[in-house]
Every structure is written in C-alpha cells, then in structure tokens.
Amino acid sequence: MKYTLDWLTNPEVFAVNRIAAHSDHRIYANHLEADADNSSLIQNLNGTWKFAWAKNPSEWQQKFYEESDSTDNFDNIQVPGHMELQGYGKPQYVNTIYPWEGQEHLRPPFISEKDNPVGSYVRYFDLNDALKNKRVFISFQGVETAMYVWLNGEFIGYSEDSFTPSEFELTPYIREKGNKLAVAVFKRSSASWLEDQDFWRFSGIFRDVFLYAAPSAHVRDMRVIADYDGTNGIFSATLDIAGKCSVKSILTDENGTVIAESNEKKSVNWTIENSKPWSAEIPNLYTFTVILTDESGNEIEVSRTKVGFRRFELKNGIMCLNGKRIIFKGINRHEFDAKTGRAITKEDMLFDIQFMKKNNINAVRTCHYPNNSLWYQLCDAYGIYLIDETNLETHGTWQKLGATDPSWNVPGSLPEWKEAVLDRAKSMYERDKNHASVLIWSCGNESYCGEDIAAMSEYFRSADQTRLVHYEGVTRVPNHQYDSITDMESRMYAKPQEVEEYLKQNSGRPYISCEYMHAMGNSLGGLSLYTDLEDKYEAYQGGFIWDYIDQAIETKNDDGKTVLAYGGDFEDRPSDYGFCTNGVIYADRTYSPKVQEMKALYSNIRMSIQNGMLTVENRNLFADTNNLSFVVRLEKNGVVLKSDTFSLNVPAGESKTLKLTLHKIDSTGEYVYHVSAVTADQTLWADAGHEIAFAQEVFEVKDNQIPETTLQKPTIVYGDVIIGVHGENFSMMFDKKEGGISSLKYNDFEYITRTPKVSFWRAMTDNDTGASEPYNLAQWYTAGKFAKYKTVSWLEQEDALKITFTYQAACVPTFEFTVTYTAHFDGKLDVCVNYAGVSGMPDMPVLALDFKMKKQLCSFRYYGLGPDENYSDRCKGARLGLWKSTAKENLSGYLNPQECGNRTGVRTLSIHDDMQHGLTFQKASAPFEMSVLPYSAYELENAMHLDELPSVRYTWVRIAAKQMGVGGDDSWGAPVHEEYRIHADQPMKLGFIITPFEA
C-alpha cells in the first residue's frame, strides 16, 4: 500500500493499518514472568533514535525510510520526548486559539503548508530471542500529532490521536537482525483541529514505544466487569483469544490466594461471596489471570490485570459508589514535567499520586486526554477516582474572545468528523475499560455540541453500563438541545451562588464542577464557599480544581541561570503567556501555599473543639478511623505545654465526641487546644504520622491587674525639625519635615532606613488583573504612594510622648488619614494608623504600614496563622501557632511576581538578623496581617518573571489592618467575593506595639 500526505488534511482518514484498540492487560510468556512483572514478550524501543527535522513537508527528506538511505547526517534524539524540548522548533503555548492564528487564515480541515514541522525518526534494532518466530506488533503509546511508519523500507501504517496507543503488525516485514524502523511525525494534521487543549503545543514521540509478540495462542483483548451488590462480587469476563489452546482463568486476592477458577475459553462468570469492595478509601484489588496452555500443558502465554469490585450508578438522581453518595474532591491534571513536558516519568506519576493522597484529593479528571496507561494502574492501587476524558477539544472553532460563535465549529454535526471522534472514544474505552478507578467517561472538553458528540455518548452507553457519561459542553447550547449527552450537570467556573441557584431548582440531576477554583498565581480564595455546599444540597457532588501543576518549562535565561518559563518566553506567537501557570504545585513539583487550603477543605475527617470537647466526624463512605492516631496538644502563646496521643475508632459516616483533659489552666495567656488526625502506620503513600486533618480551639485567660512600673523619664529634645526621645538603651526621632519616624534604635542599632509609608496598594495578583482591578482600584495606588504630608501635632503625657502626622491622599475624592506614634518612656513604641473612611472611592486593596528595613534583618518568627501564606478568604487550612521563616523563603514561587507571603491573625511578629538584632511587632487590641519579603509591592508588580526582580537591597515588612482576599472563581473577570473585600467607606484602625527583639 502506498502512503499519501493527503491523509493529513482528510478528517475521514485517521488510521491506516492500525490494529483494533484493546485492553491494556499485561502479557507474559509464563507465570514466573507474570509474578515478577517482567515480560520477555515485550521489547522496549525507548532510548536514543536517529533524527532529522524539517520545517515543513516541502523540506522533508521523504525517502529517509528506505533501507539504502543513510542516517549518517542525522542527529540523535531521545524517545520518549518532544522535538521542541530537544532543540527542534520552539515551544508554543496558546489556550483557546489555534497556534497558527494571525499567521495564516485556515479553516478545518486544512493545515499550514509552510509551518508544519516533520520529525524523521529512525531506530535500528535486532529482535530479542523471545519475540522470534511469533507474530510481532509495535505499540506507540503516544505520538503528536500524525505519524507514518515504515519497517525495512515497507510502509506499515498511519495514525492520528496523540494520546491513545497506535499499534501495527510488523510480522510480514520484520527480520531477526538489522531492522530499520522509520517514523515520520507531522506536527500538524486535520487532527490538530481536534486537539486545541489549553497546553503547550508540542510534537514528537512522547510516550513509550515497544514491540510485543503474540505467541501461537494470545489474549488479544479482555473485558472484565467486577460488579458489587453490597455483599458479593459479581464477576464476568469476556475473552478474545486467538489460536488453539486450553484456557485457565484464575482470580486471586491480595495475598495470592486463589478464590475462583474457570476453564471456559470465551467467558467467565463468578460470584465472589463476601468480596472486598474497591473504593478510593480502601482500594481492594484482585488479580485476574488467564493462562493459555498447549496440548501438553505447557504455558504459551499468561495475561494478567487487576480488578476491583465496585458499583457506580445513579440512584434517585445522585451518583453513588457501592450504594453511598460520592463527593468528588477533585483536581484537573495535565501530564507535565518542567524538563520533559508531557513525556512524564514513572517517578513523576508516583510523586503525583502520593501528593494527591497526602493532600486529601480523591479524584482526577484527565484533562483533556487519556493519560499514560501506568497512571490508571496507580489510581487503581492507591485509590483515586477518575473522569477519563477523550482526546477532544476544539475550543478555537466556536469561542472567540469569550463569545460563543459556533459558525465553523468542529466536530459539530459534520459527518466527515464523526468517525474520527468516535474512534477517539473507542480507543480510550478499549484501553481503560477494566480499571476500577475509572468511574466516568468524558466525551472531551470545550468542543461545543452536535450530533457527533451525541454519537460518542451513545457509544459509551452502549459499550459500558457500569459507568456514567460526562460532557460539560451541553450547557452552552440553547434550549437544552443536547442535555441527554451527559448524565450529570457539569459546569465550569460557575460562581458559588450560581451553583446554588441550580441546586435549588432540584432538576433531578447531580451537579459537579468539572473545572472550578482557577488556581492561577495567588488564588484559591473562597474554596470554602463551594465545599460548604456539600452539606446543604445532596445533588452537589463536588468538583475538580483547575489545576494540578504549573505548565512551565525549565530553561536558561540570558544570564545563564536556570529558570522556569511560561508562554511567550520562547518568542512564541501567538501566546497566552502566563495562563499556563495554574497549578496548586509549581512546575518543579514543589508545593505552593494554595495546597494548605485545599488539603484542609478536602479532608474527609472533620474535627471541631468547643469548650474542650472534641468532636470527630468521619465523612468517609467506607473507612473507619482505625488507621489513624489522634495527637492532642495544649499550647500557650504558641509554646507546647503538654501533648498526648490516643486512638478513636469512628465508623464511616458517624461522629464521636470526647473531653480533652491535658492540663490545669490557671495562668494568664492565650491557649490553644490543637488536635491532629495522623496516619497510625506507614501506608503506600505516606509515612506514619502524616497529618490528615486538624482542629483548634483558642481561648484566653486574662489578668486584669496592671503591673506597676517605675519609669525613668527619657530625654526629650524638641528641635526645629526633629523631635527626639532618648532613654536607656533606646532612641527615637520623629521628623516634622519628612512626616514620620526617621530613627528607631535599640541598643544603638538603627532599624529605620526611611520613614514608614502607609500603603493602600498590593502587587496585583493574576486574579486581580483578570478582574480589571488595576483599572478599577488604580486610585489606591497613588492614594498612599504619593500622599501629601500635611501637619504634625504632639502631646507629652505622663509616661509617653504622642506624635500624630496627618496626610492627604493623592486621589479624587481626596481624604485625610493619620499615623500616630506613642513613644513610651520604657522604650515601647505604639503605632496607630487611623483611616476614617471615604465615600466615592472603589474598594480598597489593603490598609498597611510598610517598613523598609536593612536586608540583614531577613529572619522572622511570628505567632499567628500559618505555617503557609494565607488570606481572609484562604485561611481555613491555616492554624494558630509559632512559626519562623525568612524573607527569601516567604517569597512565593508564582512565576508572575505578585502579592504573596501574607499571614492573618498575627499576634506577634519578630524580625531579626543573625546577630539577634531585631524588632518585635505586637498586636495592640486586634490581631493584624503581615508579610516579610525581600521586595516591595511595587518591585513585585514591576516584574513579569521572578528572575526580573532586582538584587535584594532591603527587607520589606508590611503590617496591615486588613487586606482583601485573593479570589479564585476564575482569573478573567471574577472579583473577590463581597465578604472578603474592603469597602472604602468603612472606618479602620491599624494598631501595634514595637519593642526590641528578644531571642
């Protein structure tokens, strides 16, 4: 058969000579190999390949596949891997528009003739002994976007669909030695119109490539159904076996004990009494093994797959697993590694799944394509629910600048695209159908609607009655025309009140947010407004945060420094720039501060303490708390007085209450009962002692007695410009010209570099920018930064000197505010910022006083909510405690520098250097918010990348009365929720006390 490049622009040609999709069961030559999970029937072709790159087909060396064609002038390339990350072409990030937008005017199914890079891959190999004299197949687990394959000069086949296996038989052309495998990978094809996902546009062979041999008898496919009726497992398997053989099927438990056997060749049916059901909480798995033997009883092939007994269904309009209402505490996960892109490793996947289990995530949506097959095995074993999503997104064909315009949408109801999208659905289904973790099939993402997607839904339902079907795009079509496609109401970025409005209608359908809480930059504020709906509405069944990991690429900047780059940094145009950095973890797989909130609100163990009574509520569906230990501490002002550990078994779905009795409390101070629920023993995903949930009760014992002090009055110098207060081991100077405190010394060490400034501005977050807050709130930028100092007044009291500076804000309408310093004769300094409120101004970002301090004063410890950054709308996961850090460590790793490092509920903050020089800021009446950073808000805002920030010159300490929340409903228009905003007409005071630091 001759190949043609015409296939690249024909949507009706998406596979030539490709074998039928099948289950991803493992095959072995015998049971010993199966037990060791080391198959001689598989020959891995990963590694170094010969490679040549061409900008487009006209420059492509078309005869490279011929045996006589030399590869001496070829380069080397690593497989798996992307061309663009190995020096061929450049990475490009776009979200919804197609990558050729503005370069060429194209419409489906046509592609660029000028910009369609071609990678010519060549691999020479000898056949392993175990594969000789058998039928041999090749499996490409993932290739973007279209591929032609030759072996020893003979055309083998063609395939599209980047994210499911493409397999071909090589038997007629393969030799025992000296094989030349050639693969031409085209970056663009008609399939590119179906793969408009929000990700980097890569190309190449990015998943495993291997040969496998089919012996004289071979299990081509198996369909396993492991149902569960509440007591027993109902097992059935349909086997597709080629060749003459005897068949023995075995089901074994986790201990290897055989619990069922059969000699049926085509189908197996068992009832497993008192089977252990599978769930994310208790992922019980059984092993199904099929042994093929010859007439003499010799093993020909052993096939094996893991199965979990479970029943997922709609009951009275509610999604239920094994009879219980399920809540998805989910996240969207792109496959990504900062060094290798979507060519992720087993180590990446192990980190990811362990992270999810550690941080109470129970579900993943495979946005927006089937993931590496190993991921499903891990989800089965560790316990993660999956929405398995078809590789389909055509966002740019129907939405332009946010407006819905499906005038040239594909696939729509176009017959020429129908078989292509159905093939994608079938390929995903066939590969993943036996995985217990897959609960829902998704027809794709953001592809509008039409008869073609309706056909995908019909296919899933006809092929599989054990799972539900999902597609969010039906919500965008008028008159509910295609609502029948999906079994659930699924929306993206619906506000909490919009979700609640739907739930109040009681439509009879369950609700999920397949995407919510857009975690771009400093985000995830207001997550609790969604999780609170779990208790209010039975039909609310959770959601999937967008998203798991920043898609940022490790590269070198102009100075040779290794940095993480986002869209546009590779001169890629068009680009959506930093919109690819939406992860709860950074691209290097380090945690962002957002994890703290998600972990707390996603926990199935909820605890509360009231008047010393601890209530433990177990919201698990199946698991009790026997696998947990409870650690209780009594703390005073952040210092642990006493701790204890106890066990408490709370059955799933129940609560228990007990009295905490640790210590007699009689002395003055702020006390905290702190209880942690931790893993009692080591698990597959965490060490013993890993915290799952926590609770605190804060209470205060007051002493109304005022301590008597004998003060020696300091020297007060009333100069023409400077008022000085000089006492034992301290000195303060107040500048009537500058308008503030110009010197503060303790033990002759100076702490003031310049007069502290009142600020009403924060470095705008990504969410702020998306909501046009730089425009809406701009007056607050100038209000403080360019405020005019007006007057000063002072009053000498019995034990202090009070000095008040009055300023006029640089905005319209203008207003006055004051800063009062009260210099106590014992060396304490009270500071009070007084804001009376003003009408006619927009909401205020923050009310704060900024201290520009010496850079060596970069270590800090505080007693407040922590340990990680938190805000008024993102503090449910923070706890009161005594924490320490540095200014550098406190700079969050958001790739676009922005507001970060804030803490709420702060009682005391101490800043110090290595020599123990320092200051302590103590609350006056109410706790304050604060941050300690190496940069000012204005320096952060002026940089577009972390490596653009200047060399560190100072430590910036911000003490704030209040800062508005960070939001997160979306990053393109949703403001911070009303309850977390600061209204300009609201009077506010910021008060705190400065004293010298004591180590």
Name each model feature, range by range.
Residues 1-15, 35-36, 50-54, 74, ...:
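Accessory beta-strand-rich segments of carbohydrate-active enzymes
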Residues 1-37, 193, 299-613, 620-626, ...:
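Extended substrate-binding grooves/exosites of carbohydrate-active enzymes
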Residues 1-101, 180, 184, 531, ...:
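Accessory carbohydrate-binding/adhesion or oligomerization-edge regions at the termini
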Residues 3, 82-85, 90-92, 96-111, ...:
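An acidic-aromatic loop/edge-strand motif
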Residues 84-86, 92-94, 142, 187, ...:
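Beta-strand/loop-rich accessory regions of lumenal/periplasmic or secreted enzymes
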Residues 149-151, 233-262, 288, 613-646, ...:
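Beta-strand-rich binding/interaction modules
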Residues 174-178, 240-315, 666, 671-712:
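Extended acidic/polar, glycine-enriched regions
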Residues 195-218, 551, 560-615, 619-639, ...:
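Catalytic cores of secreted or luminal carbohydrate-active enzymes
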